[in-house]
Design a protein with these regions (language model features):
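Walker A (P-loop) ATP-phosphate-binding motif of ABC ATPase nucleotide-binding domains
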Residues: 5
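Hydrophobic anchor at the beta1->P-loop junction of P-loop NTPases
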Residues: 8
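The conserved Walker
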Residues: 11-12
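Conserved glycine(s) of the Walker
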Residues: 15
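Hydrophobic positions on the alpha1 helix immediately C-terminal to the Walker A/P-loop
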Residues: 19
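Active-site signature of alpha/beta-hydrolase-fold catalytic machinery across serine-
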Residues: 22
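Short beta-strand-centered segment that lines the nucleotide-binding/catalytic pocket of NTP-utilizing
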Residues: 26-39
Length: 130
C-alpha cells in the first residue's frame, strides 16, 4: 500500500474535519491539542504554536511507522504547509492537498471577522516547492 500524506485546508466551517474522518489514515489537526481527555474543547491562543508542533510531531511519527496521515488545518498561508511538504519528501509519502470551500458554520465559535481576515490572507498552495 502507498504511504500517503493528505493535507486538507480551508477556512473554519468548510468541512475539513468531517472530510478527514472519512480517510483510512491517522487523522491529526492542531485543534486536537485543545481537547481534554473528557472530550471538551478549550482553545488557548497562547498555545497555538505548541498545537501546531504537536500536530507536526504526530504526523512525523506516523509517517516514520509507514502509516498514512491526513492533516486537517486551515493552512491559510503557504509557509504553514511547508513542514508537511518536507515530511512527505523525507518519508517518501505521496502528497495530496485538498481544499474545502463549503460553509457549514464552524463549531469552535470563530468570529466572522476573523474568518474574513483569514480569507484575505489566503494563498494558493501550488507554488510551494515540494
Amino acid at each position: 500500500m502507498t504511504l500517503k500524506l493528505t493535507l486538507i485546508r480551508g477556512l473554519p466551517g468548510s468541512g475539513k474535519s468531517t472530510l478527514a474522518k472519512t480517510f483510512p489514515a491517522n487523522h491529526y489537526e492542531a485543534d486536537m491539542y485543545f481537547v481534554d481527555n473528557k472530550g471538551c474543547y478549550s482553545y488557548q491562543a497562547e498555545k497555538l504554536a505548541l498545537a501546531h508542533q504537536w500536530c507536526q510531531s504526530m504526523t512525523a511519527k506516523s509517517l516514520a511507522r509507514k502509516q498514512s496521515v491526513v492533516v486537517s488545518n486551515t493552512f491559510v498561508r503557504r509557509w504553514e504547509m511547508a513542514p508537511y511538504f518536507k515530511m512527505a519528501k523525507r518519508y517518501g509519502a505521496k502528497l495530496e492537498v485538498i481544499e474545502c470551500t463549503e460553509n457549514f458554520g464552524n463549531i469552535h465559535g470563530v468570529e466572522p471577522e476573523t474568518i474574513e481576515k483569514m480569507k484575505k490572507r489566503w494563498q494558493e498552495w501550488q507554488s510551494v516547492p515540494q
